[in-house]
Amino acid sequence: METRVLLQPAYLLHRAPFQNTSLLVDFFTYNYGRVKAVAKGARRERSKYRSLLQPFHPLLISFSGRGEVKTINGVETGLSAIVLERERLFSGLYVNELLIRLLYNYQEHTALYKNYQETLINLQGSKEIEAVLRRFELNLLTELGYAVNLEEDFRSHLTIDPKSNYRFTPDMGFELSETNPKLEESPHYFSGQHLIALREFDLRDEAVAKSAKRLLRQALAVHLGEKPINSRVLFTGKV
């Protein structure tokens, strides 16, 4: 059965040359999640798609097709383009790459779409990059069914104690440590105080920000596999 969709809100996640004059594109859409499609002739100098198919530009796309890869029938501008520069640009590309790597095609994620849009707006503004990225990573894991529970010990169900240390196991959670490891030498152990700060998205303290980044890298790594994040290779300062 052929799919026909008109004026679907979307953001471009990635594009790559396809055949002589076309582009193979990945979109994150409001109702259909990740959509892979061909934009025919988009690389031609006079193509109407050429200037529109840019990351972080709110779009309205129309597409059709029977198979996994659809055909783009129309692209229109939506709201004003979100402009990201320097580390905020690479942070946005990092977020896009997470979606490409972790989302399946044609699975609806309307809540995540709204969160993605909010993340881009916050990156464009003056909000602290670390807090914006950690919030998105936590929301992404929750949407995929792998929520990180920052409220309690997964075995005892006791509330996280700011004076205790916890061992983190991806996709399971935090378990009270019976020992008192040196946290800087024990990558899987975290301070309860730092976990509470992350829960409240208060990453102003450098040590808390580093712990939060380490935690989310571990939580994501089991789903991303061994292939490195390209945007992290390009810019290692923030993501």
Where are these predicted regions, by residue range?
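Non-catalytic alpha-helical scaffolds and adjoining flexible linkers that form interface surfaces
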Residues: M1-L23, F28-V239
